[in-house]
């Protein structure tokens, strides 16, 4: 009897043990720097169970029975590692990965990025973080929760024409590179994300630098820089599909696939995407398509990668904004394309008031390991863009289109209705290079680029006229040509003075030559020949108080040339801008939290600030203002509150002032110490996440932007009200048989239905115009990964 009881107890205990389930949690780190690795994959071998590390480098795999497991841990740019775990209770492990001895795609962006010892201010955003939020909105909206960043959307729903400002600086002052290749338009200096829709789904990582930052290719950063790296090598074959749909008939379809590494040498990746939306604003529709294709050879000491990507966008124009009275009575009214009767009432709309543009990019990157301490990267690139704005012009004077009056017997007709297209056909090509040296205490990069924006044709076509005899079909009413040469060379040296103290020196020379000929759309001759020689030095120190704490300080000088709009719309020839930028801060990283506090001072001479006016195609007009400054404090941090709760937050307090601004609206009026246009004193962002249960995450995303002035006179009636917006996001992932992952996501934008505008303008008439944003709206997405 006693023996029977023992046997029965043993059976019960063993059954209980088998029934018990445990979890494996852990952190993945860089074995060299001890920094956490966000976005690393952790897979249980021979099982369809996996996890991806979060922003703290953490992972969790739950509901596992007792047993022995082998975990395969991978992260791009690092050697994969197998970790064995014997599971009889909940286990927590720390895994360190060694950097890959084989060259990786990261070398392409290494020269233009900052690292933890660089004494400048920056934020890294992983592709994993982008994908959680990527329901089809443009890149600016996905970066909305990085410090000191404000986003705009003409259509009001984040699809179509969008923009961003960093520390109050507009898009023309933010340097954007894709794989180290300049993306900003050479003439306008603007960044048109709409031309490469859904670029986020082909992005491996983004680094946002604030202030001047480190030397980069293209125009100097006068407010910040955004550095994108596209898809890196994935060693295993994959296929992915994303389907999203929601409010305003917004739809997104994306297909991605890759071969993985073939014969340990070759890899190919492809993506196609389609996004459509009716927009929140009336008729502000978007029809966007994009593609990405890459092929690479990965040798032990050589990487050769060819990339092509691009897009086609057709958007209905919505860049005029609405005055305050219209905002109150008809928020979604869109004056673009409106047709008026003699009494000034809207009688209809022109159905093809569109922007239609194609842009194709080609890049070839060659990376070579020269020795144990030297590697080199050479890149060639070519971009071809072409497209037009189409507009219906009511009562347009013939003389405005270079036409003679029409004489019919005793009647002279001097105006009429026309449909015109304003064309831009341009090419951008060149090469970049960098040589990188890394040994013990010394890190040295020598790099540069030569790029030409050439054969750029600006011209206007008349495609229809009310009076047929007044013009010919597709007759040109203006023609202009432009060319811009841009050369730069830089050297960056980071030296370890002691185990705790690092010195950083960054010296750059840049040459710009800009020439134009012909007329602009106002038929005024546009003949420019300008040359600039800039020297942009930077220097700083970083000091490691401990393995977790770094203090840094740097000072940088930058110079920047005017853009095309400055020349065209300026009453006097614009001057180039000069900037002195001081950055000082403290970074702390621990297993549980990361925190950064920094102070910045940006002193400008002849800053080209926004006047608050827009030109006839929605481009902001700027003017030199003598001396001005931006100064502030930025706080940012990420903390793991509990095993399930984490919080990522940032806040900026700043002052943005013109010391001596001269306003000229008929009467010259000198203004002292006025606020710089569209530069809020307060900006804050928050992402509060809860891993409610296995593979289910809920995130509350919050954004506060303070009051902004719409011109530089600091007139209280010309302001953009502060706003506080909350979004709610749900992400749930499953691992059904036969699939790597099935993801289900829901995004509730503007949870509390706040009526707000994210952007505004004034045309010098004392009237404020606003760009309203959507109230509560929804997007749902399904992601399939194989």
Residue ranges and their predicted role:
Residues 499, 601-603, 623-712, 783:
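Gram-negative outer-membrane beta-barrel transporters
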